[in-house]
Amino acid sequence: MKKIMKRNYKILLLLILLAFASCSFTTKTFADPDKDKLLIQVITYVLQQGHFDPIVMDDAFSEQLFKDYVENLDPAKHYFYESDIEDFKKFETNIDDQLKVYDITFFNITYNVILKRIEEAKIMYKEALAEPFDYTQDETFNTDYDKVSYVKNKREMKELWRKEMKFSTLSNYDDLYTEEKNSKEKDSTYVMKSDQEIEKEAREATLKYMDIYFNDVIDDLKREDWFEVYVNTIVGEFDPHTYYLAPKSKEDFDTKMSGKLEGIGARLQKRMDYIKIVELISGGPAWRSNELEVEDVILKVKQENEEYALNIVGMPINDAIKFIKGPKGTKVTLTIKKVDGTIKEVTLIRDIIQFDETYAKASLVEKDNVKFGVIDLPSFYLDMNNYKKLNAAVDVKREIEQLKAEGIQGLVLDLRDNGGGSLPAVVDMAGLFIENGPVVQVRSTGEPKQVLEDRDRSITWDGPLVILVNELSASASEIMAAAMQDYKRAIIIGSKQTYGKGTVQNVIDLNGWVRNNTNGDLGALALTTQKYYRISGGSVQLEGVKSDVVVPGKFSFIDVGEKDKENALPWDEIDSAKYSTWSNYFDYAAAIKNSNERMNNNHQLNLIEENAQWVKSKIDEKSVPLNYDKYKAKIALNNKEAERFEEINKYKTNLTFQSPLYEKELFAKDTTDLKEKRERWHQSLSQDVYVEEALNVLEDLKTSYNIKKVATVKN
């Protein structure tokens, strides 16, 4: 908490990728020798033909695209000059015309200018950090970049970089000064460094960070990466969830959806030309070898059929990873520089790496001599190549069956922070809790609606069900929560509303649209092709799913939902599907009323709400003092205010969570750190006021009925 206002300012160019389902829908082909022009040709056609609500690419479109693209290139306005923007403006109303003839002149011009300005920026930040900063001077730094104008000349640009570097260095200076002061308090004989020495060290720390940032992030960006920014800005004008996946991004997307990849099982990072190991994935080849450690540097890579090793020093990290990863069962030999400076070769056999944090996990808890189950689901994942074997619904069903075997009387499904995933997976998962019937309705432009149904008459869990959501529960999570709410099958506890993403994306392989392509992989397009609707007929677009029991959370006062996007599709509704609510032997109204009364008087939740308001007020502060005394006073005030929220993290529910029996049996022969991971999760559950209340609600529901082996839903 106390670190909130002491974070160094870091400028990063980020592309945030969200994922959904996959399919393709046409056979038209193209041919063009230039890959960039070909990509524009294919994408603009697919957008116009396949998007749910295609927009007219006219002058108004061009003007908005111009604005958004320039902002994406230089969000903090520390590269471009006012004169650059004026030069670019001659294209402001004719980018649409260029796109129609696959002309990329506008991109080429902006690309050349941004590269030039980046080289100038490297000189300016180094010049700014070469001179001592005067922290007695009374000045401020404005982080509200939307209200900052582009600089007019080099003098103003240098001043901007000076302030930015001073801002970044100020936090380092405060940390170093505090360390020296603490050392003196512990040992009266300790000789503190002078203010000049501390200030110099602080600047050196900032310089090191900036050198790493430009060398490892900015300089590694290739032309194709900048073009990806341009293409993503184009497609993003259609709606917030249509986005372009370059080949590397598509690979990352597939990994995220399946939660697995083939390789050595190590997370890598580039640090000043060297590829460094920053994490070993438990259970993976690198972890099992016992020969690799965090901070080891990979110097060379040799494939099993090659005579010589490839030197990867100085290579862009994405290129280096291509040589390190590979199919399961193949060998790779790495030349490693250990932390102590020794050089050694390590041969690994690549394997399938699974990321446990992607998958469903379950826990048992006993409350008042009654057992309940908790299932945490991070996403509605699936393996696109083997849906029946790996998908979220199959895993959740297995966890429920294990929990039932141990006699649970109620179930919590935790969908907080679950951003969605596979549409088929959520339809199958909803079917675990009803006998059969509609789950969600989807509609394409100009087509009749489709009702996606659970056709499996078996029910995996027919007992009390509570679903936890928050503002980041989106898409497939909203489909699940909405269906269970419409059926009156579950009580929804969480934020006032969920994210509000009521659209469906299909991932289109762009290579399938090109005849005789000799230009290499074109990547894919995540395209919004449908909107989905609750079985009651309403859309969750913008409005999300309204919780039955509303509780405050850390995002309560922060703009994070679909309604806060500039170009989100509108809300609408269609006719209801034919369905009947769950046989009403739960007293939902009483359970919801009791829960609301408990929540209104809950000290922990009141404190969480106050904290959320406080965090929002800090986010809204855009002016930062560069005078050290004023900065220190502000930090002291923030720390004092934050002290009253420290008890949030000390909260205890007095509940004990444990793994199901089958998982405990795995611990004995586990070669990974699964047991440790589960213990950390159980500890967090024991401090979770939302899970605590979910169990209270289950207890209320449990007392209102006798569990039936099968509960029937009539259509």
Regions flagged by a language model, labelled:
Residues 476, 488, 493-560:
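Polar, glycine-rich mid-to-C-terminal structural blocks
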Residues 25, 31-32, 48-57, 219-224, ...:
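Cleft-lining beta-strand/loop regions that shape enzyme active-site pockets
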Residues 120-263:
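Extended, domain-scale alpha-helical bundle/helix-rich regions
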Residues 71-72, 93, 107, 112-123, ...:
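PDZ/PDZ-like domain segments forming the peptide/carboxylate-binding groove
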Residues 147, 151, 159, 167, ...:
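Conserved functional hotspot residues or short segments at active or partner-binding sites
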Residues 3-13:
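Bacterial N-terminal signal peptides that target proteins for export
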Residues 13-22:
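Bacterial N-terminal signal peptides
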Residues 27-136:
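Charged, amphipathic alpha-helical regulatory modules used
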